[in-house]
């Protein structure tokens, strides 16, 4: 039975028409071995997915008939199914979980449009019995330097209700720029529009124009923030400065873009220190290189400014920062609730498809972003840098339908699910196996214990030891279950 509209069960499941799709991550991390060796399937554990939509495209009933999903999926809230944001990525995440933990009960809740919607979704799935929650939601207005409402909600669920929360790290990769604000002394649009930031680190030269490239046939988002507290979180006075982002049609910053760029000029004084810019390059088969400037319109110069450039995980649609890039090992682009104190943040590695060993995905967002303010907006005596990303899991894996426009890398007729959105549900499913294993012994595995097992058992990748790109390494469920047995 598929729970479609809230409160309505659909019993007429359609006949099976295709062969079941199974994520390559099942064998790559050895979840299949863990199930067989320890006789586990996630039974008795409830896992909730919070994502864009579940069945806006249709086809969930066929997926159930083919064994892609369990007979009952509880949909607490579906998206409104309008626009391009509803791609049923949530159903793809549920398929991945069902592959690794086929006995687990599954819930779904739409992520909504803003962090307040996510907070509501987190609380609602918790109220309906979720023991594990996984989401792939990104809101570009979420604070970078302060814990927002969703981060605080996650901390409460973990501490007060014992619910483990997993979140995708994001797909920005190395596309982040940060710097102290450097006053160029120039006003490219006139004094009333503000003084431009100087991108050039050479004190004898000035450059107020930075080139970036947005993806082909894609929508790209830039979120600029700076080190001042957000009015919407702790109250208080909010941002003391007003910064704007100006985008130009050309890489030399000669012609201001007006028709295909959205946002960038909010009055931030007394509000939140964030400017969000949308680049609509849909319909253009070519990548587009443009220039941008950052202007201080009013208030004191911030001590630190940072933007993250986010887009698709597909190479042709992925954006890039073309000059004045920060050193790779210093880049941080996992932000918002993916950097919450109590979340388990999941990055991505390539499944390989038999052609190469697993390697970190170029778009997987590294962690390490400092928290500078407390929940009341007071600057901390020392920045808090959390060890996120926690671990990595496979991406470019099979589902039955998501997405038909994505590459079929291994040519098996099954589309590949790409991004850290594909990685995160692997972690949630492994967690379900661990919770089931502990429940057999009459014990409840607390989130802090669960996270510790996943970290200690992970297969180290990249540089030796912990790193912000791959965390503690690749998930290893069989080893985690063995550690659980030894720890008793």
What positions do the PLM features span?
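Loop-rich non-cytosolic ectodomains and luminal regions
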Residues: 2-487
């Amino acid at each position: 039975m598929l729970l479609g509209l809230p409160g309505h069960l659909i019993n007429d499941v359609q006949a099976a028409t295709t062969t079941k799709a199974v994520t390559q991550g099942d064998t790559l991390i050895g979840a299949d071995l863990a199930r067989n060796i320890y006789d586990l399937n996630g039974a008795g554990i409830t896992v909730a997915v919070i994502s864009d939509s579940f069945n806006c495209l249709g086809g969930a009933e066929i997926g159930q008939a083919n064994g892609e999903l369990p007979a009952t999926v509880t949909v607490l809230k579906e998206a409104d199914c309008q626009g391009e944001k509803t791609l049923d990525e949530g159903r793809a995440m549920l398929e991945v979980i069902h592959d690794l933990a086929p006995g687990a009960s599954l819930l779904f809740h739409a992520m909504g449009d803003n962090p307040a919607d996510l907070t509501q979704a987190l609380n609602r799935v918790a109220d309906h019995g979720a023991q594990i929650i996984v989401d792939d939601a990104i809101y570009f207005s979420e604070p970078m330097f302060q814990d927002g409402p969703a981060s605080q909600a996650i901390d409460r669920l973990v501490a007060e209700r014992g619910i483990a929360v997993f979140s995708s790290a994001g797909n920005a990769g190395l596309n982040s720029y940060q710097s102290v604000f450097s006053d160029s002394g120039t006003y490219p649009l006139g004094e009333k529009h503000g003084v431009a930031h100087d991108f050039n680190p050479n004190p004898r030269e000035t450059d107020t124009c930075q080139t970036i490239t947005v993806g082909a046939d894609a929508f790209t988002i830039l979120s600029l923030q700076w080190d001042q507290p957000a009015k919407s979180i702790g109250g208080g006075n909010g941002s003391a400065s007003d910064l704007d982002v100006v985008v130009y049609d050309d890489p030399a910053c000669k012609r201001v873009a007006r028709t295909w760029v959205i946002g960038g000029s909010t009055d931030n004084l007394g509000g939140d220190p964030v400017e969000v810019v949308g680049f609509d390059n849909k319909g253009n088969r070519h990548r587009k290189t443009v220039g941008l400037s950052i202007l201080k319109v009013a208030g004191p110069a911030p001590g630190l400014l940072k933007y993250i450039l986010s887009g698709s995980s597909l190479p042709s649609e992925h954006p890039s920062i073309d000059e004045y890039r920060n050193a790779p090992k210093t880049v941080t682009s996992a932000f918002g609730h993916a950097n919450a104190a109590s979340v388990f943040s999941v990055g991505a590695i390539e499944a390989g498809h038999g052609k190469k060993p697993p390697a970190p995905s170029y778009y997987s967002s590294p962690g390490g972003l400092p928290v500078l303010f407390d929940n009341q907006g007071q600057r901390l005596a020392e920045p808090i840098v959390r060890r996120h990303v926690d671990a990595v899991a496979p991406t470019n894996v099979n589902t039955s339908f998501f997405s038909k426009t994505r590459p079929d890398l291994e040519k098996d007729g099954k589309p590949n699910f790409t991004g850290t959105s594909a990685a995160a549900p692997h972690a949630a499913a492994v967690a379900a196996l661990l919770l089931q294993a502990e429940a057999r012994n009459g014990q409840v595995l607390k989130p802090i214990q669960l996270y510790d097992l996943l970290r200690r058992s992970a297969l180290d990748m990249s540089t030796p030891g912990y790193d912000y790109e791959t965390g503690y390494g690749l998930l290893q469920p069989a080893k985690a279950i063995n550690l659980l047995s030894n720890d008793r």
